[in-house]
């Protein structure tokens, strides 16, 4: 059973291919015939102006004229936007370029603010979302000012829905960053800028080429850091399935395919080029061959086998030929015979590159420009035949050669980026990768290795540039209604307008205001012959407007220009009302809006306005009897003609659909209810008034008194439809930012001043008893003084130490620290985080700090309080005065009483004698009387007590 299903499916597939081939046999596929949905999103804000908007419409007509219009081809939609978007032309509404052009020319300029994001969202929801064709979707956004709403996120949503966005900015007020946010990437392909609307015609051809690339070249080829639209013909012809032998290419790291007579590189053209070829492209091939005959490197055949496009080489004459289509003769061939071509036949590796445009073709060999030749106009190709590589002319036999690359790039600019670096002996860096068919890839495209360890933290960067302006804030609240702008020059006849409302019985009066929407200028100048001649055959014929030969029908045409009947059936669009007369409505929500379709009446009675339409326009009479002629393009406003004679009252038009509720207007007091009046005589039609805001439909009532004119507003000069909003509410304070990373170590600061002396440290532990020192040299003999006890002397030293030791230590520390070499201390442990401080204003990034100096060596702790001195040993007995020469050591004598101070001369110091034997401890003597105040050297006492220098390391001595 599965086998039967497989066979049936195969039969159906084969039949479907033949069906497609036969169906497309008479259709030349090209950019013109490619099916896609194309939507223009046009800026209709005040900054554009009516004249520039006319230029914009002509530009749209010129762009769309390059495509076949219809369900099988391109479908065009148009959205105009200002404060709100309006669906001017739905997708698929027209099936001919003439009808589409006429409808495009009839679009009326809106005026208002710039809400670009809202318009893009409107196109997504109301055009692309309703299209049932799974085709290329393209939107072109044209604007001349900064959007007053968010465009970035809405544009991202469009791209998620596979909508390609082009952005075209006009004038000096445009922001490049906003255009880049709207358009696809790269911006060099999808963003355009011109200085004014006159210059927009300069990008018409390049815009046509880009649109063709989107519809004809859907595939992408990875080249360097970007993807180029184009065709990899080797892959398209299934080279990997043909069992072609892989060999070494132009360089050792490149790989190529060896094509032999046993390998047939043939494929159905519809599978390789489903929409034909673009109007301009770059053909490139890297190859090596030894063939001495004529052969086709690449060719596209029609169903009958005739060549439509081909690149051929002639080994006998050493020439290269390019064949393509032609409108007159079907095909045209260009042969390059210059000496630069002959190097192709030296049996070495070479690169052939052809830059094909709509006007000419240029040959490059190994990146050297050889010659440029003119081309006749080219037409599309039949895709029902075959595409082949490496074939002899008019034969199916394959040629033996080696092929490394065969591609077509749809963007002509790729010709400037392409190099021949893969050819030995040429200069240039290979940015496109080493090969098209495999081998060792360049380092830049190798698969990533394992993630390495984090590197050291880099230095702080320089302060960043100021950030880009933030997104526009939310719309402000509606302000008080501005004063009504001063009426235009022809505003005086508007007084008779209320009589017209009375004739339509109240609510239908709003329909009349709907008829005034669009304000196309004075209708009398529609179709000046000069302007229509400039428009040419692109839909600017203005058939009826030019000749004015239809008499009464001409009058009817003038009336139709005011009514714009084609736009009345679109619900939700905002009309522009004239100067309000007796409103007849309650008026609680502002001026009544224009939801109706008054324009269908034709408004007879103003035949004098057209002026140039001939003498028949002087009398309205029975203008409804004839069929209205085709509408000509809107002409530029001119001097108003004389006021025509009132015609008979026309029939009451049908009531239009209710329009959307407009922004609330300033409330006005309700008029006094009057008696219902009889139908009044229709007055002369007033000139188009200043556009007002459409309010919600009020309760039906009788005619009231005319409301008072409002106060003059800030933007009332042209009756802007939008109410100026108040400044937006200040945004809430942002959330506190995250704690930043730890900064680098700061610059080493200068050495600080010595700090104040710290508190005396806690007493240290008692030191161990030191070894007994050697006996010092005897000092000079002093005068005999009063004998003092050891305890008394010790107490004096302790008192002196307590009084003077702190200052001595402090001075000693300062001296030692000023002389010692600062050593680098180890960094301390980070302290605990401090409490969160109040949020400060965000500062600019600081400059990177330098490394700080090493900290000072910490002060050593103060010495502990000296331990209690042991009891002194028993002093030895004083010996007798020795002679000059030392005598024998005598035995210790008994201490005698203190004698009077003797007056003697110091003797010479004798040699050091042997240490004496410690004498027996004698009984303590009696306390003597207090002696005179002596002078105790604190340093001696300090040394005696401490037995060492506390700032010196080493043994005690």
From Swiss-Prot:
Its main location: secreted. Residues 1-16 form the signal peptide. Residues 441-788, 820-935 are annotated as: Disordered. Keywords: Collagen, Cytoplasm, Extracellular matrix, Repeat, Secreted, Signal. Pfam families: Collagen, VWA. The keyword Secreted applies. GO terms for cellular component: collagen trimer; collagen-containing extracellular matrix; cytoplasm; extracellular region. It is found in: Secreted, Extracellular space, Extracellular matrix; Cytoplasm. Residues 535-556, 733-744 have a biased composition (Basic and acidic residues). Residues 37-211 form the VWFA domain. Residues 448-501, 502-543, 544-591, 592-642, 643-684, 685-741, 742-786, 825-882 form the Collagen-like domain. InterPro entries: Collagen, Collagen_Structural_Proteins, ConA-like_dom_sf, TSPN-like_N, VWF_A, vWFA_dom_sf. Residues 230-412 form the Laminin G-like domain. Residues 483-498, 597-616, 633-649, 775-786 have a biased composition (Low complexity). PANTHER family: COLLAGEN ALPHA-1(XXIII) CHAIN-LIKE ISOFORM X2 (PTHR37456:SF6), SI:CH211-266K2.1 (PTHR37456). Belongs to the fibril-associated collagens with interrupted helices (FACIT) family. This is Collagen alpha-1(XXI) chain.
């Amino acid at each position: 059973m599965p086998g039967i299903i497989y066979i049936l499916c195969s039969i159906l597939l084969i039949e479907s291919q033949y069906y497609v081939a036969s169906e497309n046999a008479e259709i030349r596929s090209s950019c013109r015939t490619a099916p896609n949905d194309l939507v223009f999103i046009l800026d209709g804000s005040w900054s554009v102006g009516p004249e520039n908007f006319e230029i914009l419409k002509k530009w749209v007509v010129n762009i769309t004229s390059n495509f076949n219009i219809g369900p099988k081809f391109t479908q065009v939609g148009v959205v105009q936007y200002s404060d709100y978007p309006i669906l001017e032309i739905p997708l698929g509404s027209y099936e001919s370029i003439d009808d589409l052009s006429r409808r495009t020319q009839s679009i009326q300029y809106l005026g208002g603010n710039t809400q670009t994001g809202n318009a893009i969202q409107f196109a997504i929801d109301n055009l692309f979302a309703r299209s049932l064709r799974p085709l290329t979707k393209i939107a072109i956004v044209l604007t001349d000012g900064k959007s007053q709403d968010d465009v970035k996120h809405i544009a991202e949503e469009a791209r998620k829905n596979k909508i390609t966005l082009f952005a075209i900015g006009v004038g000096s007020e445009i922001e490049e960053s906003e255009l880049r946010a709207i358009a696809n990437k790269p911006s060099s392909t999808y963003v355009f800028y011109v200085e004014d609307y006159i210059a927009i015609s300069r990008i018409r051809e390049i815009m046509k080429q880009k649109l063709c690339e989107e519809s004809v070249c859907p595939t992408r080829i990875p080249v360097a850091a970007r993807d180029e639209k184009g065709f990899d013909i080797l892959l398209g012809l299934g080279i990997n399935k043909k069992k072609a032998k892989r060999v070494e290419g132009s360089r050792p790291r490149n790989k190529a395919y060896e094509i032999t007579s046993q390998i047939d590189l043939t494929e159905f053209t519809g599978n390789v080029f489903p929409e034909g070829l673009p109007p301009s492209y770059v053909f490139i091939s890297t190859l090596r061959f030894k063939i001495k005959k004529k052969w086709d490197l690449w060719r596209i055949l029609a169903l009958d086998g005739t060549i439509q496009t081909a690149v051929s080489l002639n080994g006998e004459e050493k020439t290269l030929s390019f064949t393509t289509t032609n409108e007159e003769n079907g095909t045209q061939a260009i042969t390059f015979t210059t000496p630069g071509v002959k190097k192709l036949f030296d049996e070495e590796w070479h690169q052939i590159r052809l830059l094909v445009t709509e006007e000419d073709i240029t040959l490059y060999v190994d990146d050297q420009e050889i010659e440029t030749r003119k081309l006749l106009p080219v037409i599309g190709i039949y895709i029902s035949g075959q595409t082949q590589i490496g074939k002899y002319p008019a034969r199916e036999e394959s040629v033996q050669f080696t092929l490394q690359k065969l591609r077509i790039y749809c963007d002509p600019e790729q010709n400037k980026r392409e190099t021949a670096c893969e050819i030995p002996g040429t200069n240039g860096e290979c940015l496109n990768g080493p090969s098209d068919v495999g081998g060792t890839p360049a380092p830049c495209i190798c698969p990533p290795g394992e993630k390495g360890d984090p590197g050291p933290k880099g230095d702080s960067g320089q302060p960043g540039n100021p950030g880009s302006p933030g997104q526009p804030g939310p719309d402000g609240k509606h302000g008080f209604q501005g004063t009504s702008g001063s009426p235009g020059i022809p505003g005086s006849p508007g007084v008779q307008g209320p009589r017209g409302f009375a004739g339509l019985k109240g609510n239908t009066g709003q329909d009349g205001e709907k008829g005034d929407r669009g304000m196309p200028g004075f209708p009398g100048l529609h179709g000046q012959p000069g302007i229509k001649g400039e428009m040419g055959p692109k839909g600017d014929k203005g058939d009826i407007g030019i000749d004015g030969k239809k008499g009464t029908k001409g009058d009817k045409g003038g009336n139709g220009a005011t009514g714009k009947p084609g736009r009345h059936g679109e619900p939700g669009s905002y009309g522009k009302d004239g100067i309000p007369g007796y409103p007849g409505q309650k008026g609680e929500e502002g001026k009544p809006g224009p939801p109706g379709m008054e324009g269908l009446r034709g408004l007879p009675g103003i035949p004098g306005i057209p002026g140039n339409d001939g003498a028949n326009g002087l009398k309205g009479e029975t203008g409804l009897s004839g069929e209205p002629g085709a509408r000509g393009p809107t002409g530029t406003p001119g001097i108003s003609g004389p006021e025509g004679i009132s015609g008979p009252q026309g029939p009451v038009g049908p009531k239009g659909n209710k329009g959307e509720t407009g922004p609330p207007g300033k409330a006005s007091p309700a008029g006094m209810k009057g008696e219902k009046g009889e139908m009044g005589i229709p007055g002369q039609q007033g000139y188009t008034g200043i556009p007002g805001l459409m309010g919600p439909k009020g309760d039906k009532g009788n005619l009231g008194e005319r409301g008072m004119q409002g106060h003059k507003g800030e933007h009332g000069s042209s009756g802007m439809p939008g109410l100026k909003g108040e400044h937006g509410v200040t945004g809430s304070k942002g959330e506190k930012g995250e704690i930043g990373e730890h900064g680098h170590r700061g610059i080493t600061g200068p050495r600080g001043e010595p700090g104040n002396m710290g508190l005396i440290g806690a007493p240290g532990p008692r030191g161990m008893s030191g070894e007994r020192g050697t006996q010092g040299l005897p000092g000079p003999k002093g005068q005999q003084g009063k004998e003092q006890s050891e305890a008394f002397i010790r107490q004096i030293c302790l008192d002196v130490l307590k009084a003077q030791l702190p200052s001595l230590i402090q001075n000693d520390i300062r001296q030692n620290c000023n002389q010692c070499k600062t050593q680098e201390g180890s960094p301390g442990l980070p302290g605990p985080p401090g409490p969160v401080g109040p949020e400060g204003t965000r500062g600019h990034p600081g400059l990177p700090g330098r490394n700080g100096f090493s900290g000072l060596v910490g002060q050593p702790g103060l010495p502990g309080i000296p331990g209690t001195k042991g009891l002194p040993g028993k002093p030895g007995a004083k010996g007798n005065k020795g002679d000059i020469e030392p005598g024998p050591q005598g035995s210790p004598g008994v201490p005698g009483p203190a004698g009077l101070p003797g007056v003697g001369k110091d003797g010479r110091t004798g040699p050091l004698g042997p240490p004496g034997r410690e004498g027996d401890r004698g009984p303590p003597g009696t306390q003597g009387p207090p002696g005179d105040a002596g002078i105790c050297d604190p340093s001696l006492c300090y040394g005696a007590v401490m037995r060492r220098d506390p700032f010196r390391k080493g043994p005690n001595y």
